Amino acid sequence: MKAAGEDSLDKFYEAFWGHIKFTLSNAARSMWTGITGARGLPSPACEDTKRYYQQMTRFSTAFALLADVSMFVIGGSLKRKEKLSARLGDVLSLLYLSSCALKFYDQRGRLKDELPLLRWALYDCAFKIQVAMNGIIDNFPNRPIAFVLRRLVFPRGLTLIQPTDQMGHEVADLLIQPSAARSRLIAGIYLPDDENDVIGKLEAAMHAVIAAEPIEAKVRAAKKAGRLTTHGAEAQWDEAMKLSVITETELAQWKRARALQHDIIMVDDFDLHFGKQVAAPAWQQAEAAE
């Protein structure tokens, strides 16, 4: 851009051909890293995150290639092709988020208990990057160039997968019970003590449900042993208290946990007449007031 503003054809050609060489080298590198799965690329000396650094390097190269080719072929019209430019923006954002996650993990001392969180986040980002890049190529206006781009960016096809259910379970296990990793993750976020606040109620429900687990275990054991003969949760718990399986305090503790749990899972639960008065025309509201 500087060369274009100067009255020097030599400087312009130097910058122009330098950029062409850069794009061609990115094309070759993108194809090679796609074939090899980015294996062999330099990365920080940490086996737990090595492959993620390599994959993000591969996608950074592919992104530079797609952005350069898009500008070269589409030019100023790229800003009017909003879905195409938005996908390029998605890739850039996801690369940035992936870099932040890796840097965050590295600077906090590469704590092993945070690895499931990092793994899930990077699998998710990598898959979404793949989807966005595939969308760019699928909708590229110049189809012959799109054909070439697909061979350069995805020489082995779409090989990345979404985070597996097992990864999700590992993350959930960290988040649904108190742990050092969970405490570090939520440090500094808004977390009120008020149970009338949705976030505060969620935190209170977690602690209440965990505290009630040993009590529930005693009731289940009594039921399995045939000591409880009633049906229905409420009746069984009342019977368990009468038989001294649990104390009155434990029964109250279980009921509180059950109530909090019920409130948390009842999403989009509104009164039957919620909003009816506001939705009614003004003349109907006036008649109702009379």
Model-derived regions: residue spans:
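Flavin-dependent oxidoreductase catalytic core characteristic
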Residues: 1-290
